[in-house]
Design a protein with these regions (language model features):
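N-terminal auxiliary segments of SAM/dcSAM-dependent transferases
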Residues: 1-64
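Conserved class I S-adenosyl-L-methionine
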Residues: 96-107, 123
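Conserved SAM-binding loop of SAM-dependent methyltransferases across substrates and taxa
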Residues: 108-120
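Conserved SAM/SAH-binding beta-strand->alpha-helix loop
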Residues: 128
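Short alpha-helix immediately C-terminal to the canonical SAM-binding loop
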Residues: 132
Length: 132
């Protein structure tokens, strides 16, 4: 992904206190907080890193989320493995580009996304319907 933000894309809003909010952009959507709201249309079509202002004058920097941002801010249905633990797990597990991995209990998908970033090919098995 490069260039301007598009509808359907994830965006990371960061306020003046460095609080982070992961949002999926859509033309009718609005990001609401205690500091007013920002229509998604004021982000769609702009470049990452541009400031946007809420209706109450609060400023946010809007960026494309990294894998780490997504893992930290994602909704939690299962126990999440945090970025500080993911890299050592991949190293100990000898995950490398082209490795074939069978993952049982995919859960939130944080480990799967990290192994994919390392270039592994993953087959996952999840029994719980609410994690699919």
């Amino acid at each position: 992904m490069s260039g301007v933000f598009a509808e359907g894309e994830k965006a990371l809003f960061i306020d003046s206190k460095q609080r982070r909010y992961l949002i999926q952009l859509n033309k009718e959507g609005e990001f609401h907080s205690h500091a007013g709201f920002v229509p998604h249309t004021s982000v769609i079509g702009t470049l990452p890193g541009q400031p946007v202002e809420s209706t109450k004058g609060s400023k946010y920097i809007v960026l494309r989320p990294t894998l780490e941002d997504f893992v930290i801010e994602m909704p939690r249905g299962a126990q999440v493995i945090y970025p500080k633990d993911l890299a050592p797990m991949c190293m100990i597990g000898d995950i490398y580009p082209g490795a074939r991995v069978f993952e049982t209990g995919v859960g939130s998908g944080a480990l799967s996304m990290t192994m994919l970033r390392y270039g592994a090919h993953i087959t996952g098995l999840e029994l719980r319907e609410d994690f699919m």
